[in-house]
Regions:
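Internal, well-ordered alpha-helical scaffold/interface segments
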Residues: 250-253, 282
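Oxidoreductase and adenylate-handling cofactor-binding alpha/beta cores
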Residues: 253-260
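Cysteine-clustered segments with highest specificity for TGF-beta superfamily mature ligands
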Residues: 267-269
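A conserved active-site cap/scaffold subdomain adjacent to cofactor or substrate pockets
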Residues: 240, 244-248, 264
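Conserved "HGTGT" condensation-loop signature of ketosynthase/thiolase-family condensing enzymes
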Residues: 2-134, 138-147, 153-240, 257, ...
């Protein structure tokens, strides 16, 4: 009749213990959960994994470059945009008593690489990334009005889930027909907004998943949120903290606390899994204006968004559809290009040449021609 949902992240404790040479033990997982969910597909294809590894930042940086090209920003304009965008997140986090980092960072600090803000994958620096080195936890209790009444829980402590949607359609980033427009996200957003509008429900607060700036942008675009509306109430994952595998619960708990303070407020929360692979959205309100409705749009998305085949050409010419420059220990290590060959199929190319890495950070490479031979990068432009 009631459920307790609990989650947390203690990675900061682990890191401090390792730094100080102290023992750190995690509770052993000796029992399987009642229901275990495992994806049928992998998050990435082999070519992506070889070029970018398992860390998410490179994949999101590639998507960010495609978004930059779509919005016709110059590289400098884009760097300024990202700095200003997350400066506002930092300001909001500074006023959040639950934020992990309440320091206010300026746009200049965020966009400029430094020893404390190392570049990781262009255009992303450390302050563009989610911060998972935190000690944070949250919990929710879900129950019915009937049980709440029996327990004499006052109405002012109750918040209601109104509508939610999700997509679990999985395609590796390189095989997505449009890197900046996931079909599942469009379908899930359409259902959520149309269902809410039928009941005259309009969100007043947003908490858009903010593992990296492009995730916020994609949700904001899909939801058609005006530029002057804040996209977070917490301050976002780089500043409020991004407890690994638990941020959705953390954001929801804070949203419900905010809604409790004002009966007229309605909160919209979004979530992501993988490399902008799966998306979920939910609307909560103080007033139970509708019976809860939910939809999984996965099957519809699978029919509409088919993976683009990987290239079988070993040599030829293609067009860059996304790119980044990866860093290791604050030094550039390689440029990574997602490209489309002459047959419209996809390939991943890399270069460790310093002039190519510099070019990725000096001029727009998305849209340029790229030449390859024996499955290796030859030239750009």
């Amino acid at each position: 009749r009631a459920s307790l949902i609990v989650g947390g992240e203690a990675r900061f404790k682990m890191i401090q213990a390792l730094k100080e040479g102290l023992p750190y033990e995690e509770m052993a997982l000796t029992e399987n959960p009642d229901n275990y969910v495992k994806a049928k597909e992998d998050l990435y294809v082999a070519e992506e994994l070889d070029a970018l590894g398992m860390m998410a930042v490179g994949y999101y940086a590639i998507i960010e470059s495609a978004m930059r090209y779509k919005n016709q920003y110059s590289l400098k304009e884009h760097e300024n945009f990202l700095g200003n965008f997350y400066e506002r997140f930092s300001q909001i986090a500074s006023k959040n008593p639950h934020a992990w980092n309440q320091k206010i960072y300026t746009a200049e600090e965020i966009k400029t690489p430094s020893n404390k803000n190392q570049r990781i994958a262009y255009p992303y620096n450390k302050l563009h990334n989610t911060s998972w080195n935190v000690n944070q936890a949250s919990a929710l209790i879900l129950t019915s009005d009937e049980i709440a009444d029996k327990l004499k829980i006052p109405f002012n402590k109750r918040v209601y889930p109104l509508v939610s949607s999700e997509t679990n359609h999985m395609i590796g980033v390189i095989q997505r027909p449009d890197l900046t427009s996931p079909v599942g996200l469009k379908l899930a957003t359409k259902y959520l907004i149309e269902t809410a509008e039928k009941h005259n429900i309009k969100p007043t607060f947003y908490e858009l998943y903010s593992c990296f700036p492009v995730a916020v942008q994609l949700f904001s675009e899909a939801l058609n949120i005006p530029e002057n509306i804040d996209k977070t109430i917490t301050g976002g994952m780089p500043f409020a903290g991004g407890p690994l595998n638990n941020y959705m619960l953390h954001a929801t708990a804070q949203m419900l606390m905010r809604i409790r303070e004002n009966n007229s407020e309605v909160g919209l929360i979004t979530g992501v899994s993988g490399m902008m692979t799966k998306q979920a959205l939910a609307i909560w309100g103080k007033n139970p204006a509708m019976d809860f409705e939910s939809k999984d749009v996965t099957k519809e998305a699978e029919k509409l968004e088919l993976p683009v085949p990987m290239s079988k050409l070993s040599s030829g010419e293609g067009k860059v559809i996304g790119c980044t420059a990866l860093y290791e220990k604050n030094m550039p290590s390689k440029a990574v290009f997602y490209a489309e060959d002459s047959q419209g199929h996809r390939l991943v190319l890399t270069s460790t040449m310093s002039e190519i890495i510099k070019q990725v950070e000096a001029e727009e490479c998305v849209g340029l021609k790229i030449n390859f031979s024996n499955n290796r990068f030859v030239s750009l432009g």
